[in-house]
Amino acid sequence: QALLPNMRQQNYGRIINIGSVHSVVASPFKSAYVAAKHGLLGFAKTLALETGDCDVTVNTLCPAYVKTPLVENQIAAQAIENGISEQEVIDKIMLAPMPKKAFIGIDELAATAAFLLSNDARNITAQALVIDGGWTAR
């Protein structure tokens, strides 16, 4: 919100939030995380409504699992907790709900963000762009 006055004055701005697939769906045992991600999406949609009178767009990228250090730690922790191998965590827990069975690449997120920053996306606002390998199709 600190940037909005400047964006309004210039009549231009692009805001991209990084949410999660959990911005649009829930999962058991993740209530605080899901609530935070839903809140981020609500904030983005509200901000998009508030900036609809100028060339400012507000969108949220909602990826499924991206292989980051945080996810690597989750894999190791879940392997110990469930008494299974890390590969089994990846195959049977993390990628199981995704028809594509692959982690989302940083390059995929960057390409989507680059498009949203372009003038070709000037009428795309208040959107949750879900990049989830088909997870939410179920």
Outline where the language-model segments fall.
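A short, exposed helix-loop element centered on a Lys and neighboring polar residues
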Residues: 1, 45
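C-terminal substrate-recognition "lid" of short-chain dehydrogenase/reductases
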Residues: 4, 12, 100-131, 136
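Residue(s) in the substrate-gating loop at a strand-loop-helix junction
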Residues: 20
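Active-site loop immediately N-terminal to the catalytic Tyr-X3-Lys motif
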Residues: 25-31, 53-54, 101, 119
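Active-site helix of classical SDR
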Residues: 36, 44
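Short, flexible catalytic-loop segment of classical short-chain dehydrogenase/reductase
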Residues: 41, 63-73, 77, 81
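Short, small/polar-rich loop/turn modules that mediate ligand/substrate recognition or access, typified
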Residues: 52, 57, 124-126
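Catalytic Tyr-x(3-8)-Lys segment
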Residues: 80-106
